[in-house]
Amino acid sequence: MSELASMKCEACQADAPKVTDAELAELIRMIPDWSVQVRDGIMQLERVYKFKNFKLAMAFSNKLAELAEEEFHHPGIFTEWGKVTVTWWSHSIKGLHRNDFIMAAKTDQLLD
């Protein structure tokens, strides 16, 4: 289990700090299959997972939904035939928080 995946999310309020540039550089190395995207001025983590068919993609999406409910932190999930695009960001701070990196690592573990 990766160091990030073993952590729990903390409650993220609107005044919580976004990750600094130094933290971003350190944390993104821990989840190398993820990329940073900026949409509408909001920094987000994104990864595309590939599957053999829609049924497997949907099963992964459902597992991710369960994980999100357990951690009370919810991603953008776009499910299509053979592919699931997952996007993590903290809505309350309109950017990236340590929680997003924790959840990205936990999302990767769903493949195991």
UniProtKB/Swiss-Prot annotation:
EC number of the protein: 4.2.1.96
GO-annotated biological processes: tetrahydrobiopterin biosynthetic process
Family annotation (InterPro entries): PCD_sf, Pterin-4-alpha-carb_dehyd, Pterin_deHydtase
Domain of life from the UniProt record: Bacteria
Transmembrane segments: none
Gene3D superfamilies: Transcriptional coactivator/pterin dehydratase (3.30.1360.20)
Keywords: Lyase
Catalytic activity annotation: (4aS,6R)-4a-hydroxy-L-erythro-5,6,7,8-tetrahydrobiopterin = (6R)-L-erythro-6,7-dihydrobiopterin + H2O
Pfam families: Pterin_4a
GO terms of molecular function: 4-alpha-hydroxytetrahydrobiopterin dehydratase activity
Assigned protein family: Belongs to the pterin-4-alpha-carbinolamine dehydratase family.
NCBIfam families: PRK00823.1-1 (NF002016)
Protein name: Putative pterin-4-alpha-carbinolamine dehydratase
Organism: Shewanella amazonensis (strain ATCC BAA-1098 / SB2B)
